[in-house]
Amino acid sequence: MEQTYEYAWIIPFIPLPVPMLIGAGLFLFPTATKSFRRMWAFQSVLLLSIVMVFSIYLSIQQINSSSFYQYVWSWIINNDFSLDFGYLIDPLTSIMSILITTVGIMVLIYSDNYMAHDQGYLRFFAYMSFFSTSMLGLVTSSNLIQIYIFWELVGLCSYLLIGFWFTRPVAANACQKAFVTNRVGDFGLLLGILGFYWITGSFEFRDLFEIFNNLIYNNEVDFLFVTLCAVLLFAGAVAKSAQFPLHVWLPDAMEGPTPISALIHAATMVAAGIFLVARLLPLFRVIPYIMYLISVIGIITVLLGATLALAQKDIKRGLAYSTMSQLGYMMLALGMGSYRSALFHLITHAYSKALLFLGSGSIIHSMETIVGYSPAKSQNMGLMGGLRKHVPISKITFLLGTLSLCGIPPLACFWSKDEILNDSWLYSPIFAIIAWATAGLTAFYMFRIYLLTFEGHLNAHFPNYGGKQKTPFYSISLWGKNGVKKNSCLLTMNNNESTYFFAKTKYPIDKNGRKMTRPFMTIAHFEHKAVYSYPYESDNTMLFPIFVLGLFTLFVGSIGIPFNQEGGNLDILSKWLAPSINLLHQKSNNSMDWNEFLKDAVLSVSIAYFGIFIASFLYKPIYSSLKNFELINSFVKKGPKRILWDKIINGIYDWSYNRAYIDAFYTRFLVGGIRGLAEFTHFFDRRVIDGMTNGVGVISFIVGEGIKYIGGGRISSYLFLYLAYVSIFLLVYYLLFSTL
């Protein structure tokens, strides 16, 4: 086993040859490299599969031995400072490695078909392989310096993939927004790393924890400075995991290809922030107030993400806000000290959310043949509906992921979310009420997405659809090269329109949409022309990863179920995490009071079913047919209560549709303030600083010109004036010193 650990350093570097060879091939032999492009995709999957097998083997060894391994190379700079590089294999590393590789393999297989007609196919696979390398390097890092290096590489890859179709201004702006927002968190992370090095003199995790605990125990640190450094470290995780208030980049990141949305939201970028807090939890837990801050940020994000998902028309943006809310649950669990519950939910949510994103990609892929290659159309749930008849496999798997995220047993997220909800009662009743209420909201908005997508009739074939009249329709060509056809503000809303939160109000589509009675897709590269009037199911290359992730969603929750009756121990996750739990000095209690569990489970499932019922009543097609009946209309007659109810509903809709006005606040005050400061600085530089410099030059020029005209341009006059000035100076000098 020791020999196996010695070769674990190679894990991050196994996928690295693919992006290097693709880059070299495209530079030296572009035609030949493109002609064998599927070979490069196969190599990406093969190398990541090798990493997956290696990671699974290491995990089995850890479960059996309950140990961790660290190896460090020291780079001695001088006697006072040495920079160490190494790798750390512990339960957190092995869990993240398996998560990254399994989800990454499924996404790569899926992408082979999804990106088949894109000119950037090879570039996409190069970015994806480098993304996997960066994330594997992050989770195997043994010190804060390595963490920061791979942290930046993970960010770089995510920016490249978010802005993959960079010729579209909306994608380029989304990439820029993600970059700028994460710069704030990354700068805080760097300052926090340097601050803790100044306190402890070490970057290595084990040394850092030991030295810092001794300093705290002996009361030898400034708690205000330590708390500030901890907050700065946490700021990096807040930005990366899209926690309030640095969450604004996440919905715009949906401008990238759908497969990368699945990878970012399941196992890479947003998981990096949760990983960092989990890795540094032994540090945070001994600092007053920092754990409470983590839990507060988590519970705010839980509620905010759920409310922002309520009115989304874009299927990917709805799932993005769902990710934000679920990451808030994980952050809440870490803030409460529930290390096991947080990682359990990280695992179950990763597979469920990857399933949902790949399922949405399959739906978008089928809708593109009907409405065209425009994200504003193909991702708009107002143009969907009735897809259960056309994409039955995608419908079943999407329903599976939806039920899992709602917390319906026996699916994966039920087991992990229930643990967090139960722990929240012990931590804070207020937090518990918010967390449980948000569980109902989660069931509501997830089933809203499902019903708008799969139930009813296909709205794309009707001249009207339930969307916004002024929605900007951005065109994306087959190769991802077309730009924006029409510029429009993302958050523009016509308040004169009678829009209700739960209503299925119809709005006229533009002229091009009305003429699309028999839409078809023609691809010049194909040997034949394909004409489609209805969406069609994706092929097996895309369905296979969805099917596998569906199996994970069904069964992965079993690893954390403590079925240890009569002394048996079948809780795999607790045994797996035993070394990390011991490091946190927590008691690993694998036993479960099944009566207490069933009572809490009944409550959580009842709340979830209530949310599903409300969504079904408001969005299921039966409501559209019943609401015209006189009996139903008698309940919705205009009156003071009805008007008040409409105002409340419209207020909630505006809050959700306008992203809680946070983006508008940042745009007006932060962006506007910075631009105002820049304009003032520009004015001060041009008018004051340059004015002083130019003024000296102008004055010198005027004086010189005046002297020139006084002298008349004759050398004899200049000599006369010079001698006169010298004589006057000597006379004054003589008179002054002769009187002393």
Swiss-Prot record:
How does this protein lie in the membrane?
Multi-pass membrane protein
Instruction: Give its E.C. classification number.
Output: 7.1.1.-
List the GO cellular component terms.
Answer: chloroplast thylakoid membrane
Check the record and name the Pfam families matching this protein.
Answer: Proton_antipo_C, Proton_antipo_M, Proton_antipo_N
Domain of life of the organism encoding this protein? Eukaryota
One GO BP annotation of this record: ATP synthesis coupled electron transport
State where the protein is found.
Plastid, Chloroplast thylakoid membrane
* Single Gene Ontology MF annotation: NADH dehydrogenase (ubiquinone) activity
* Disulfide links within the chain: none
Tell me which UniProt keywords the record has, alphabetically: Chloroplast, Membrane, NAD, NADP, Plastid, Plastoquinone, Quinone, Thylakoid, Translocase, Transmembrane, Transmembrane helix, Transport
Reactions the enzyme catalyzes: a plastoquinone + NADH + (n+1) H(+)(in) = a plastoquinol + NAD(+) + n H(+)(out); a plastoquinone + NADPH + (n+1) H(+)(in) = a plastoquinol + NADP(+) + n H(+)(out)
Please give the start and end residues of each transmembrane region.
9-29, 40-60, 89-109, 125-145, 147-167, 185-205, 219-239, 258-278, 286-306, 327-347, 354-374, 396-416, 425-445, 543-563, 602-622, 717-737
Q: What does this protein do?
A: NDH shuttles electrons from NAD(P)H:plastoquinone, via FMN and iron-sulfur (Fe-S) centers, to quinones in the photosynthetic chain and possibly in a chloroplast respiratory chain. The immediate electron acceptor for the enzyme in this species is believed to be plastoquinone. Couples the redox reaction to proton translocation, and thus conserves the redox energy in a proton gradient.
- Give the PANTHER family listed for this entry: NADH-UBIQUINONE OXIDOREDUCTASE CHAIN 5
Q: Member of which family?
A: Belongs to the complex I subunit 5 family.
Quaternary structure, from the entry: NDH is composed of at least 16 different subunits, 5 of which are encoded in the nucleus.
Q: What is this protein called?
A: NAD(P)H-quinone oxidoreductase subunit 5, chloroplastic
What species is given as this protein's source?
Nicotiana tabacum (Common tobacco)
Q: Which gene encodes it?
A: ndhF
